[in-house]
Amino acid sequence: MKRNFISSGLIMAIVLLPGLINIQVLYAQKVATSIQSDQSVAYQVVFDITSKDAVAQNQVLRDAGLIRDAHPDAQVEVVLYGQSLDLILKDKSTHADEVKSLVDKGVSFKVCHIAMDHHHISESQLISGVGTVPDGIYEIISKQKQGWGYIKITP
């Protein structure tokens, strides 16, 4: 009885093994094709920052810069609202040079106009090259609907 069970198991393994190998090969081919197609599509990333925390602000600048440096054709946008606005104000930012450098590299900084109104900030107070959007949250949602990757920066 044991011998028949073992024999049956071996026969099943011999019969099923080629099919399993074929499945693995097909999966590997699909993964390789997926990787190749991912490499041909430019990265599109939107960062969401609301914090005045220095660590969070350093992180968004570092991460946006690293993505842009690694993928020069990437579309990178940083959306600022809430308490994060000091990062892009001419007279308050401790990172003005970094922001300008990233803008020069093609990173887009967009400030929520609702937040600007709430904090009594005018466009003339923004670092050169920083733009505005009517609503920061709507901007992020729009980018996500277009297939952009989303990264929330938290302290």
Question: Which positions does each model-derived feature cover?
Answer:
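Positively charged n-region of N-terminal signal peptides that target proteins for export
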Residues: 1-4
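Secreted/extracellular ectodomain signature
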Residues: 26-155
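Bacterial N-terminal signal peptides
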Residues: 9-22
